[in-house]
């Protein structure tokens, strides 16, 4: 018998362990030691931790519960996303990440920029009794104020256990200059409601015209 499952790795490794535990109905505390490239999830808990401090917390700290999302039968503890740049995390080679760290993600994303921005997804989304629709270049449902290594100012008050997930949907635009301004606004917290949907909810349904990734 085990008292705790200890995970060393990045956001993806932790997510795989959470999925296994949820699907197999395993109820044990997870001790997480971040050892990946971005480690967004750990930053929401302790941004300045060290391996020694994480080990002390695992050995002597008190377990706590946090929100886990479910998307088409797959669980996520950090983020579920579609559209531009979402392939970057799994298309970036392990060798590149070892050499360049987070820069490997950035270079991969820049290399795929034209294809990413041309990936438009038309969909309806339903939340809190409201049905809306649009065509989007990017969408994310997250449980963290940081996504892809970037902190989102309008989600600064987000917590892991508030029963809500943060939703971000960015409209597809053919004008690259306008799209650049919109994305810059997302990064700085100055969002344009004409092009960006940003809200919190405990449940959201997406209805797409075609398979989306």
Provide a role label for each language-model segment:
Residues 127-128, 133, 159-162, 169-213:
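ATP/nucleoside-binding phosphotransfer catalytic cores, i.e., glycine-rich phosphate-binding loops
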Residues 1-8, 15, 19-20, 24, ...:
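ATP/NTP phosphate-donor binding region
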Residues 140-150, 187-190:
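Phosphate-binding core of ATP-grasp and ATP-grasp-like enzymes
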Residues 9-10, 33, 80, 171:
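Small/polar loops that bind or transfer phosphate-bearing groups
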Residues 86-88, 133-135, 146-151, 175-179:
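Short acidic/glycine-rich loop or secondary-structure boundary segments that cap or lie
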Residues 96-104, 147-150, 156-176:
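Gly/Ser/Thr-rich active-site loops/lids in small-molecule metabolic enzymes
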Residues 23-141:
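Catalytic core of DAGKc-family lipid kinases
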Residues 18-21, 43-45, 152-153:
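Short amphipathic alpha-helical segments
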């Amino acid at each position: 018998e085990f008292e705790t499952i200890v995970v060393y790795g990045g956001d993806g490794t932790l997510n795989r362990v959470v999925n296994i535990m949820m699907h197999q109905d395993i109820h044990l505390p997870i001790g997480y030691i971040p050892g990946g490239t971005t480690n967004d999830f750990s930053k929401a808990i302790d941004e300045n931790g060290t391996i020694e401090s994480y080990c002390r917390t695992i050995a002597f700290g008190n377990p706590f519960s946090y929100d886990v999302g479910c998307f088409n039968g797959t669980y996520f503890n950090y983020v579920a996303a579609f559209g531009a740049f979402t392939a970057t995390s799994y298309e970036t080679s392990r060798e590149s990440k070892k050499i360049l760290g987070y820069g490997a993600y950035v270079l991969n994303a820049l290399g795929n920029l034209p294809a990413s921005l041309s990936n438009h997804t038309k969909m309806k989304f339903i939340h809190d009794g409201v049905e809306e629709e649009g065509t989007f270049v990017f969408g994310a449902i997250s449980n963290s104020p940081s996504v892809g290594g970037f902190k989102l100012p309008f989600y600064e008050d987000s917590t892991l256990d508030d029963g809500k997930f943060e939703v971000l949907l960015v409209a597809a635009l053919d004008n690259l200059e306008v799209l650049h301004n919109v994305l810059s606004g997302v990064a700085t917290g100055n969002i344009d409601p004409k092009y960006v949907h940003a809200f919190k909810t405990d449940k959201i349904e997406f209805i797409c015209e075609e398979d989306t990734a």
